[in-house]
From Swiss-Prot:
Keyword terms, alphabetized: Cytoplasm, DNA replication, DNA-binding, DNA-directed DNA polymerase, Nucleotidyltransferase, Transferase
Function, in words: Confers DNA tethering and processivity to DNA polymerases and other proteins. Acts as a clamp, forming a ring around DNA (a reaction catalyzed by the clamp-loading complex) which diffuses in an ATP-independent manner freely and bidirectionally along dsDNA. Initially characterized for its ability to contact the catalytic subunit of DNA polymerase III (Pol III), a complex, multichain enzyme responsible for most of the replicative synthesis in bacteria; Pol III exhibits 3'-5' exonuclease proofreading activity.
Protein name: Beta sliding clamp
Protein family (similarity comment): Belongs to the beta sliding clamp family.
GO BP, sorted A to Z: DNA strand elongation involved in DNA replication
Originating species: Streptococcus pneumoniae serotype 4 (strain ATCC BAA-334 / TIGR4)
Molecular function as annotated in GO: 3'-5' exonuclease activity; DNA binding; DNA-directed DNA polymerase activity
Cross-referenced Gene3D superfamilies: 3.70.10.10, DNA Polymerase III, subunit A, domain 2 (3.10.150.10)
Subunit details: Forms a ring-shaped head-to-tail homodimer around DNA which binds and tethers DNA polymerases and other proteins to the DNA. The DNA replisome complex has a single clamp-loading complex (3 tau and 1 each of delta, delta', psi and chi subunits) which binds 3 Pol III cores (1 core on the leading strand and 2 on the lagging strand) each with a beta sliding clamp dimer. Additional proteins in the replisome are other copies of gamma, psi and chi, Ssb, DNA helicase and RNA primase.
Length: 378
């Protein structure tokens, strides 16, 4: 029968992290619970939605936790309800005691709340990933890669493989990550400091975004383990499992052009602000596009909406080379791409009005390239 006391705020923080893997509307009702596992070493909180699973460990040795364990065991509690109850408790310290099979009493200050739980044996087992040699990355670096690519993945389930980000390690240290929804593409390449085993996996972009939320910047490094259809991201106290997407990712290398007819370098902030103004009106037009005109070295953006009005704006540039061009595209794609850049300047290169154009950072030597497909207009 479980019995422990703990700092309420730290416990609540750990519960909220674990809850990111828990869906209250799951087809499997037991997955709307959080599993609380108490051992001599500490407390493990477990949550899963079938796609991702999070194990969050609070160590007996963690001084901030003020953890005092009197007796061991495990129990399932309805996650959202339990977290709401814990957050409402008045005192800094929380006492958690199982009084009879799967029934607990929470005591804090003068408040005492009794809750019914469920037998932890009902909870599905998380498939263990056998201990192999992990790939070790800086957490900040992995989160940066995710920020630069995951936004370009598809949100449509019609082609499930495109809802993921393709991670490929070749020659033991050359990492390439790509995401595309077939209208836009984002690709980041880098050379790792240490050699690792090659891999080729597609990780759901939704799982990667959750990873970024769960692994805060104070976690310096993350260990990455691969198994048949799963990947595990692990730090000292958090294990984050996600299923991989099955199938072959399309060959995106052939989509990337190398020869261009027009090249422009912009200030990222200026261009983004221009596009955000243009989008205010383009969202009211039938095709939602903005027209970019390059003529005699001058670049301007145009939107015309019969219902709302029009935008004509000359955009400052640092450099314009090549042929004149008029091209239409979805401004949201360009805004998203600019948000993913960590540079002050961007170079955009065009072939023609109907061929995809590329964006690369102009003032860093990062191997980071984005591609946007234009929209054909009359």
């Amino acid at each position: 029968m479980i019995h422990f006391s703990i700092n309420k705020n730290l416990f609540l923080q750990a519960l909220n992290t674990t809850k990111r893997a828990i869906s209250s509307k799951n087809a499997i009702p037991i997955l709307s619970t959080v599993k609380i596992d108490v051992t001599n070493e500490g407390i493990t909180l477990i949550g899963s939605n079938g796609q991702i699973s999070i194990e969050n460990f609070i160590s007996q040795k963690n001084e901030d936790a003020g953890l005092l364990i009197t007796s061991l065991g495990s129990i399932l509690l309805e996650a959202s309800f339990f977290i709401n109850v814990v957050s409402s408790l008045p005192d800094v310290t929380l006492d958690f005691k199982e009084i009879e099979q799967n029934q607990i009493v929470l005591t804090s200050g003068k408040s005492e709340i009794t809750l019914k739980g469920k037998d932890s044996e009902q909870y599905p087992r998380i498939q263990e990933i056998s201990a192999s040699t992990p790939l070790i990355l800086e957490t900040k670096l992995l989160k940066k890669i995710i920020n630069e690519t995951a936004f370009a993945a598809s949100t449509q389930e019609s082609r499930p493989i495109l809802t993921g980000v393709h991670f490929v390690l070749s020659q033991h240290k050359e990492l390439k990550t790509v995401a595309t929804d077939s209208h836009r593409l984002s690709q980041k390449k880098l050379t790792l400091e240490k050699n690792s085993d090659d891999f080729d996996v597609v990780i759901p972009s939704r799982s990667l975004r959750e990873f970024s939320a769960v692994f805060t910047d104070d976690i310096e490094t993350v260990e990455i383990f691969f198994a048949n259809n799963q990947i595990l991201f692990r730090s000292e106290n958090i294990s984050f499992y996600t299923r991989l997407l099955e199938g072959n990712y399309p060959d995106t290398d052939r989509l990337i052009p190398t020869d261009f007819n027009t090249t422009i370098t912009f200030n990222v902030v200026n261009l983004r602000q221009s596009m955000e103004r243009a989008r205010l009106l383009s969202s009211a037009t039938q095709n939602g596009t903005v027209k970019l005109e390059i003529k005699d070295g001058v670049v301007s953006a145009h939107v015309h909406s019969p219902e709302v009005g029009k935008v004509n704006e000359e955009i400052d540039t640092d450099q314009v080379t090549g042929e004149d061009l008029t091209i239409s595209f979805n401004p949201t794609y360009l805004i998203d791409s600019l948000k993913a850049l960590n540079s002050e300047k961007v170079t955009i290169s065009f072939i023609s009005a109907v061929r995809p154009f590329t964006l690369v950072p102009a003032d860093t030597d990062e191997d980071f390239m984005q591609l946007i497909t234009p929209v054909r207009t009359n």
